[in-house]
Amino acid sequence: MRLTTSVLLWAATSVLQADATQTYRSPTGPEAYGAYPPRYTVSYTTITSTSTIHSCPPRTTTIFTSSPPPDDGCKFPGCPNQPPKPGSDVHCDIYCWAKGCSLCKNDTCPEQGGIYKRREDMKNIFGRSTGSAEGYNYTPETTCCCCCEPGGGKHTVTVTKTKTETKTETASITKIITDYVTKTVLIPTTVLEPTTIIDPTTVPTTVPTTIPTTVYNETTIHDSTTVSTTVIQPTTISDTTTLTTTFTTVVPTYITTTTFGTVTSVVTVMVPTTITSTYVSTMYTTLPGTTLTTSVTVPGPTVTPPPVTLPPETKIITLPASTVTKVTTLPASTMTVTSTLPASTITQSGTTVTLPGSTTVITSTIPASTITQTYTEPGTVSTVTSTPPPETHVITLPGSTITKVTTLPGTIMTVTQTLPASTVTQSGTTVTIPASTTVITTTLPASTITQTLTEPGKEITVTKTNTVTTTTTSFSISLCPTRTANPTYTPLAPLPSNYIWGCPPGQLCRPKRTPADGQCNFEVGLPSQNFVCSPDECIPSPPRHPPQKWTPGKVEKWVVSPGYFNIDPRKFGLTFDIFSFENVTATSQGYFRRSLSALFKRGPEIVAGECYDECDSAATEAEAVGADPTLCKPDSLFMKLVGQCKKCTNDRSNGTYSDFDTVLFPEFQKWLDYCDTLPIPSGPTTRPEPGMTSSTTSSPTHSTVITSMTSMTTSESSTSMRSSSTATTSETSSTESSRTSSESSTESSTDSSTTERTRTTSTAESTETTEPTSTDASTESTSTATHSSTGSDPESTNTRHPSSTASGSTTTRGGGGGHGSSSSEGPVPTSMGTATTTGGGSIPGSGTGIPPSSSTDPVPFPGGAGSLSPSTWGKVVTCISSMALLVAFI
């Protein structure tokens, strides 16, 4: 009996102990798996290079150079060692030099290069060796005349010269820029200790990284040069003039008809006699006048008009894109990573072992690296002004036909007709009549003769003077620093929620240039969500370029709308040479600085470049409208463009290109977050889903906790989990995230989903409940004091933001959008379906994504139990053992 009882007791104890060793899966993240952390330590260092475009200077003329002050002991600006004396030229010279100017010569300044004259009152200038607290005051009449230009010192100004000449100018600029050298240093450290630790231990890790290096990139942008050339082009204009001359000549025509008749009379007498008569008749007939038309060709005259001056012609010559090469050599740097592990207590069966705290110092020396930056500048637009030579135009007129009508007077035509002699036989006698002549005169009326003469064409020579003006405009891009914070303005009170970058709807932020910006002329990407403009920097939204649409599958030129921020083309794998500028005026001397920490960031993931037109159009539309309710309407242009941008990028996301949420969601987050604050209309809402912010509770959906390794970042604090003396250090950039909560997401493969959003208010806190309906999984998610939504396919337009369905995790995409207690500016990269971040760090995992939907068991963490609840068989065995114990006890 005792043996049976002991066996049953042992079996029950084993089952209970096996169930008790199973770890509870906390909804806050993978801290519950503290008993089974990975057994290695990995340290990551990200090196990212940035670049500055340099352009070669053109021919310049130095028109003003401020000379250094005399060496009289004054070695610092604005404060001579001795008190200045009123009217002293020496001290005025020092004073002007300290102001970055030069002393006026004869009270005048050069009138070139923007140099202006100002008078400075010498007041309150302390004598350095006097110790006076009041200083030396002078009357307003004690002034110094200084010739100043912004910046002071020696200034080089490009003077625009115009000259007239006949020439053909071909300009070609070739520049080579090499950019982005990424160097990754991996320092694997493995500490093995055959000890099993039951309790998780949080190890604060401090990674001191000091890189006191500042890289200054000089960029010089030169003014345009206008060359006017007068070209005289001879032009020959051929003209043909037809002259018709009508001559009327009256030609009288006389027709004389003469009739000659011979009459022979035959008289018959008693004796038959033969009489022969011959008649000759002459008839004169006057015919009417006739009109004769004669065509005469007369050679055309040559007309030479005066010279004609044609208006100037402007030819625009677009030069091909140029490439600039810049090589920056960085010195070697040493990075020391110190991980301090506190004392830990190890509990084993029967014994308690307390391990002292350990400190691991990892020193890594990064050798000097050479960063070659390649940028392709957009082709320069060259406009050449030239005056062509006088043009001589010879105009040859066609042959002219001159019709001359000549009217002839009436003519007299004489017709003589001779009749043969006739014989008349009379009986008895023969009488012969001599021949007679009859003259008939006819007078014809006057006739008109028309003659048409065709003259040959004549040549007219016209000399035309053409003035062709070609303007060569050389434009270079000088990148401005990223707008993260405004050093010149801080609002006194919180701004309304519909203010974007400190400006109300309908207005756009245009930051003023600061000395730190130098003479930059192009903003790199959109400002940070925390950037605030002062009220005087808010301007009405300027007009934009007409809508632009690229040919599908091609990358073309993108015309920049002045005053608007454009998405960084490098996020699309493009360069700045896609930009085209209309009516640009180049500035002089671009200068900005980049810290070395920015150079050590890895380049961001990119999306397909052919989607830039749709995405940038959505950004400029949002900038023009602002945070206004009309922007958030489902049929608004902004929502349509965002949907097209997201569809284009997600359809092309593969191993080479990333998706919308990973790269572009932070660009649109500020406007989408504003739309989320508007009242929710009744019924389903159709909107694009460009981003995600959700918090879900435990559900039947199972997920595998893995870690995205797509980007490596750096942080000054992290949380490690320790098992068998295996220290894990995960470093996350503090600029990317400042959260301490765990983040996990599971992407949904549902092609379409319907989200119904309701708000529930309780006495303790505000709760949003989202009830998703999809074809793959049915989950109920609830978030407390955070935004909650259910994710769907990128093409779904039912909700504003895509979300993820996770098991007991909190997922924030793009820094949380201001919800909850976490804040971030960048997106949280995900990989293999789920991204998990714990305590600001990143722990590499071995998960392979979401298990098939047919899976019924939870995916176990390596070395951990599946769940806290005992299995069915365990319950049965425990129940039987308990009953046996009870019977044995009785």
Swiss-Prot record:
Main localization, broad class: secreted
Lineage, top ranks: Eukaryota, Fungi, Dikarya, Ascomycota, Pezizomycotina
Listed Low complexity bias regions: 693-753, 760-790, 803-812, 821-837
Membrane-topology annotation of the record: Lipid-anchor; GPI-anchor
Glycosylation sites recorded in the entry for this protein: N106, N217, N583, N654
PTM per Swiss-Prot/TrEMBL: The GPI-anchor is attached to the protein in the endoplasmic reticulum and serves to target the protein to the cell surface. There, the glucosamine-inositol phospholipid moiety is cleaved off and the GPI-modified mannoprotein is covalently attached via its lipidless GPI glycan remnant to the 1,6-beta-glucan of the outer cell wall layer.
Name of this protein: Agglutinin-like protein ARB_02240
Biased composition (Polar residues): 791-802
Lipid attachment, kind GPI-anchor amidated glycine: G864
GO BP annotations, alphabetical order: cell adhesion
Family according to the record: Belongs to the ALS family.
Any GO CC annotation of this UniProt entry: plasma membrane
Start and end residues of each stretch annotated as Disordered: 680-872
Annotated function: Cell surface adhesion protein which mediates cell agglutination and host tissue adherence.
Entries under PANTHER family matching the protein: GLYCOPROTEIN X
Localization, UniProt: Secreted; Cell membrane; Secreted, Cell wall
Leader sequence segment: 1-20
Propiece residues: 865-890
UniProt keyword list: Cell adhesion, Cell membrane, Cell wall, Glycoprotein, GPI-anchor, Lipoprotein, Membrane, Secreted, Signal
Bias (Gly residues) ranges: 838-848
Source organism, top-level taxon: Eukaryota
